[in-house]
Amino acid sequence: MRPNRIGVAVVATCLIATGCGGGGGAQDARSAASGSFGNLTGICRPGDASSASAPGVTADEIEVGTFSDIGFTRYRDFIDAAKVFTSWCNAAGGINGRTLVANIRDTNLTEVHQRMVESCREDFFLVGGGAALDGLGVKDRLSCLLPEFPAHVTTSENTGSDLQLSSGATVSEGVDPYSGFHDWLINDEHPGSANSIGVLVGDSPITEVMSEKVTESLTASGATVVYNEKYPPAGISDWTTYARALRAERVRGLIFLGEFRHLGRLQEALTDIGYQPDWIDANATSYNAEFLGAMRDSLENRNYYVDLSGIAPLDAAARVPAVRQLKDMFDQYAPSSDITFQVLRAFQAWVLFAKSAATCGDELTRACVYQAARKETAWTAGGLQAPVDLSRPLAEQTRCFNVQQATPEGWKAAEFGPNTGVFRCGFTPYRYTQDFGRPITLADVGRSISELE
C-alpha cells in the first residue's frame, strides 16, 4: 500500500482553494519565490534535472520518508511540518526543479520494522520524523543504506547510529543535554529546591532508562532526589495518590517525563490537596498551545518550565527572521495547525536536507546529500537553532539551552541569562557513567560507509 503523499497534490489543492488560507501575503510569496529560508539563500529553486540518479529519485520527483506514530498518538506535528515545508519548497521550484514528495510512514507505535522495509524500497532519504520505538528499524535502515535527518530520536540503539545526522538534544544520548538547564533551575532560579527533587515518569522501558539517567545526573550535580516514581503510561483516572506522595516527600522541584495531558490531571490533584512544588520541568514536548489550555487555571501562580535545548522559540520572531518566516509559512500552508517543539525540530531537519540536496545538482545521490550535510560545522538551520558542528558527534560538543515558561499570555522566555542571541551556550553536558546501551553501526549489519552511493 502506498503511503500518504504530500507534494504536488498539496500545491495544486492550495492553488485551487484560494492559496491555502491567509497569513503573510506578499512576504510569503517573496520567500517562496526566492526559495531562501532565514539566512540561507536559494535552498529550494528551479532547475533542469534530467536523471533518475538514485532510489526514490526521478527527473521530476524526490521521494522522502517521514516517520510518525500518528496512528497511535494522533499527533500531527511531523506531518504538518512536512506539509508546510514541501509546499513552500515546491512553490519555489523544488530541489533544482525536482518536486519534493513526503511519504508519511505511519508506524502506529509498533510497526517500525514494516514501515522501514517500505521506506527502504521507495524512499531516497528519511527526513523530519521520529517514532517512539525507533530502535526496531535501525538494522533495516542501515542494511539498505538509507540515511536519515530525523526530527527526534528515542532509543539508544538509534541515537547517533550510522548514516544519521541529528542536531537536536535527546535524553537517549550518552550525555545529559539538560544538565545546563537543570543547573540553572536548581541552583540559580530556585536554589531552595536542590535537596528536594522529584522525578515522575510514564512507565515504559524507554522512560525507565530516562529516569535512571536523570537521577544519575542530578545526583552527580549535588542535588538530592527524594521521590522517583512511575505511573501507568495510559494515565489514571485519579492522581490523588501521586499528589499526596509528592506532598509527603516535600518535593519542591518536579521533573515530569510523560504525556503533557497527564501532567494536567496531576496538577488538578495537586490543587485539590493544596500542595504545589516550587517548579515543574514539564519537558519540551509540552511546548504547545494545548498544554497552555490544559493548564490555564494554574498559569498565574505556578512555575512550569521547558528547555528547548538550542531551538529558537516562537516568541523570538521579532529577533529571529527564520522564526518569523516559519510562522508566516504556517499561516499560509497550515493556518489551523499549532507550531510545537516537535514541529521546530522537524523543520530544521527539512532545511538541512534541502540545503544539502541543492548542492548536488542533477546527480542527486544519498552519498552526496549525506556528505554535504556533514560539512556543516556551524549549522543553525537558517537561524532556527544554536550552532551545531555536524562533522562531529553531538555528544562531544558543548551545548546551549534556552528556557521557556508557561504564562497566562503564552510561552515566554524565562530570565535564564542568554549569552548568545536567544540562547545560553557553553556548558558541557554531564556524561553518564552507567552503560545505557550504544547506537547500532553499519558494521553491526555487515555494511560499510564506502558502499553508500
Stretches with model-predicted labels:
Residues S167-V171, L270-F347, G437-T441, V445-S450:
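Extracellular/periplasmic periplasmic-binding protein-like sensory domains
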Residues S31-P55, T377-E453:
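Solvent-exposed, acidic/polar segments of extracytosolic/periplasmic ligand-binding ectodomains
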Residues I16-G19:
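C-terminal motif of bacterial Sec signal peptides marking the signal peptidase cleavage site
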Residues R74-K83, A92-L163, Y231-W239, G264:
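Beta-alpha junction/loop-to-helix N-cap segments that form part of ligand/metal-binding clefts
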Residues G21-G24:
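Bacterial signal peptide processing site
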Residues D203, S211, F260-R265, I311-E376:
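Extracellular/periplasmic ligand-binding modules, especially the Venus flytrap/periplasmic-binding
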Residues A49, D123-K230, D278-Y304:
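Extracytoplasmic ligand/sensor domains, especially the bilobed periplasmic-binding protein
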Residues L40-E61, G65-K83, R105-N108, G202-V209, ...:
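Extracytoplasmic "Venus flytrap"
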